[in-house]
Amino acid sequence: MILVDANQVMIANLMVSLSQTEKLQEGLVRHMVLNSLLNYRSEFKKKYGELVLCYDNRHYWRRDEYPHYKGTRKRDREKSKHNWDNIFELLNKLKAEFLDHLPYKVIEVDGAEADDIIAVLCKQQGLANIRLQNNLQPPVKTLILSGDKDFIQLKRYGYVDQYNPCLKKWVEGLDPKLYIAEHILKGDRSDGIPNFLSDDSCLMEGRRQKSLAKVKIAKWSTLSPEDFCTTTELMNQYRRNQKLIDFEFIPKDISEKIIDTYESLVPANRSDLSSYFEENELNDLVSAVNYF
């Protein structure tokens, strides 16, 4: 299967459209996103199977655990020249259209991000591949379409490839075990997660994080946290990052909802796609409908 980080694909296309014209153009964004999906399917379906569009839900379980999660993004949007209320309104409209009209599984789960959906489905396929190989059958390959390096850790399951559609290059060459160990230590500033030496509020309050030297990262990434977390505070901050960053810590109830939703989804009928394109004046896509 081809797991598409749909939020990333949509926002990337939307930002390209805004670079061409300052006004948000619904028709242009719709066409660009659909054309991107057509290109992905044409290039990768033969090797990896069908597209699965994975979306963020408005409610994140990580924010329940850590209120500052992605808090810096909201602050940055408030400083942006773009009207993000209008942008999110358009993205939600297109998501609803795709659910109703595209012949793929379009999945959104309460409490989950697209990252969670992709991680859970990769793990599920990894377990299925073990059973297939035990029965002397070939494993099923999975492709992640996203530039997010968080997904490097999913290569631990085997037969998982990642392609960055924005840079048009494969994401490879990094050891998933070492990557996740370093990522937990360093945190993720873009998600509002400080390094494990720093307290919860430092990024939101604009304070500098405590210095974490590269030599320490190189050493500690090969050790158990019990070997270098010398205080309860440090251990708690390490566990904070581990829970937020390592996909193995996705809550069981979220994982079960993702699997149940995926297995129960029935894609829209491909035969109805032409009328959707015609209604939205996507005339050049009508002729390519059989390739969707």
Each language-model region and where it sits:
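Short, polar loop motifs at secondary-structure junctions
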Residues: S146-F151
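Non-catalytic nucleic-acid-binding/docking modules located in mid-to-C-terminal regions
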Residues: S42-Y55, D76, H82, K123, ...
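Short acidic/glycine-rich loop or secondary-structure boundary segments that cap or lie
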Residues: I152-K155, S211
